[in-house]
């Protein structure tokens, strides 16, 4: 017999497996927050939902249901059913969900059954699954040891993390590199989507039973994405690994990240001329964002050097002069700030080393030597 209701006990399995999901909520609800494996194929669009909601408040549930049927009928109803069937043809194992796992899920399931498709819906809907994911974030720090990877700007922390199976890449989830120049071309996720994706990454990490959870030593805000407070507090108590890198390698890594990759990305998106203009604005606006912290004199020196580098790149197709302002940025801003912050938490430093030494240290790590007791 085909199951028509997926119980809340299967939330973990849904997210770990990346189960295809049909989100029946209106677009306005979906855009506030959803799940990575979901697609929005609403039962009612925004205006229809608004009318039904007003009717529910004024006349009650039965009147609202009747209005919903009158709004979504005939050709409109068939269009919605066809959209669901089209998705199910490509993803036959998909589940349905609405906000609470109530009327919208049940009605959609009924219409699909009449069309010849038996599709389960998720108990508790979006609200139940969202609350479950919040709980995952809150409880994870107590379930396994946390280690925080620190290192000067340009030391290659993200490059290192993505090579480690015990790591979760917070900046990748936030789509932001964490620094003043960390903005990417594509926008960051909504706060809710950031939290949902973080929780799912943590679930998958737990599934693999690693000896620890390795995270980058982040600020509370990664761009505009805020780490959940309890999770951030746990990170602030974690032992620290300091990734060390030679200055020339740091400079060239930042040249590649800030200049080569960003310029290429803007050009691919917008074309040569508009892409270069957008790239220039990205650099100049990033610098402007730290103007107060730099002070007027240092800001002007950096801006002038950056403008010269952009002019050389535009006229001679050379990027080497960008190293001048990147070097100034490290000397005048990033490095002093990092050294000050690390000094305050020096008592939490567990290990220092370059990429190779850090890999070897983590490879030799065992659950016994990294228990909650000797980390705390």
UniProtKB/Swiss-Prot annotation:
Monomer. This is tRNA 2-selenouridine synthase. HAMAP family: tRNA_sel_U_synth. The active site is at 98 (s-selanylcysteine intermediate). Keywords: Selenium, Transferase. It is an enzyme of class 2 (transferase). It catalyses: 5-methylaminomethyl-2-thiouridine(34) in tRNA + selenophosphate + (2E)-geranyl diphosphate + H2O + H(+) = 5-methylaminomethyl-2-selenouridine(34) in tRNA + (2E)-thiogeraniol + phosphate + diphosphate; 5-methylaminomethyl-2-thiouridine(34) in tRNA + (2E)-geranyl diphosphate = 5-methylaminomethyl-S-(2E)-geranyl-thiouridine(34) in tRNA + diphosphate; 5-methylaminomethyl-S-(2E)-geranyl-thiouridine(34) in tRNA + selenophosphate + H(+) = 5-methylaminomethyl-2-(Se-phospho)selenouridine(34) in tRNA + (2E)-thiogeraniol; 5-methylaminomethyl-2-(Se-phospho)selenouridine(34) in tRNA + H2O = 5-methylaminomethyl-2-selenouridine(34) in tRNA + phosphate. It comes from the Bacteria. Its EC number is 2.9.1.3. NCBIfam families: PRK11784.1-2 (NF008750), PRK11784.1-3 (NF008751), tRNA_sel_U_synt (TIGR03167). It comes from Shewanella oneidensis (strain ATCC 700550 / JCM 31522 / CIP 106686 / LMG 19005 / NCIMB 14063 / MR-1). Pfam families: Rhodanese. The keyword Transferase applies. The gene is selU. SUPFAM superfamilies: Rhodanese/Cell cycle control phosphatase.
């Amino acid at each position: 017999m085909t199951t028509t209701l997926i119980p809340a006990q299967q939330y973990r399995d849904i997210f770990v497996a990346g189960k295809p999901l049909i989100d029946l909520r209106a677009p306005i609800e979906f855009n506030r927050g959803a799940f990575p494996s979901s697609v929005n194929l609403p039962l009612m669009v925004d205006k229809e939902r608004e009318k039904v909601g007003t009717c529910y408040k004024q006349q009650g549930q039965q009147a609202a249901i009747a209005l919903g049927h009158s709004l979504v009928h005939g050709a409109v109803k068939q269009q919605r059913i066809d959209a669901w069937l089209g998705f199910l043809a490509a993803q036959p194992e998909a589940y349905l969900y609405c906000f609470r796992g109530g009327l919208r899920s049940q009605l959609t399931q009924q219409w699909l059954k009449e069309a010849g498709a038996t599709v389960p819906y998720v108990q508790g809907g979006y609200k139940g699954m969202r609350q479950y994911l919040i709980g995952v974030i809150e409880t994870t720090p107590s379930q396994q040891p946390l280690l925080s990877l620190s290192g000067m700007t340009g030391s290659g922390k993200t490059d290192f993390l993505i090579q480690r199976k015990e790591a979760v890449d917070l900046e990748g989830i936030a789509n932001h590199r964490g620094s003043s120049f960390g903005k990417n071309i594509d926008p960051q996720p909504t706060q809710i989507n950031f939290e949902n994706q973080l929780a799912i990454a943590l679930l998958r990490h737990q599934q693999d039973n690693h000896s620890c959870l390795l995270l980058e030593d982040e600020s509370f805000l990664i761009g505009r994405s805020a780490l959940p407070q309890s999770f951030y507090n746990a990170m602030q108590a974690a032992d620290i690994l300091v990734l060390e890198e030679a200055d020339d390698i740091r400079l060239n890594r930042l040249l590649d990240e800030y200049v080569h990759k960003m310029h290429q990305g803007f050009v691919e998106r917008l074309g040569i001329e508009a892409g270069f203009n957008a790239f220039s604005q990205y650099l100049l606006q990033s610098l402007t964002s730290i103007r107060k912290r730099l002070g007027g004199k240092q800001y002007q020196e950096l801006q002038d050097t950056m403008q010269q580098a952009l002019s050389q790149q535009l006229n001679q197709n050379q990027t080497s002069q960008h190293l001048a302002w990147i070097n100034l940025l490290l000397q005048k801003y990033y490095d002093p700030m990092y050294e000050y912050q690390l000094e305050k938490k020096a008592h939490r430093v567990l290990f220092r080393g370059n990429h190779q030494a850090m890999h070897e240290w983590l490879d030799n790590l065992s659950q016994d030597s990294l228990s909650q007791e000797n980390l705390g």
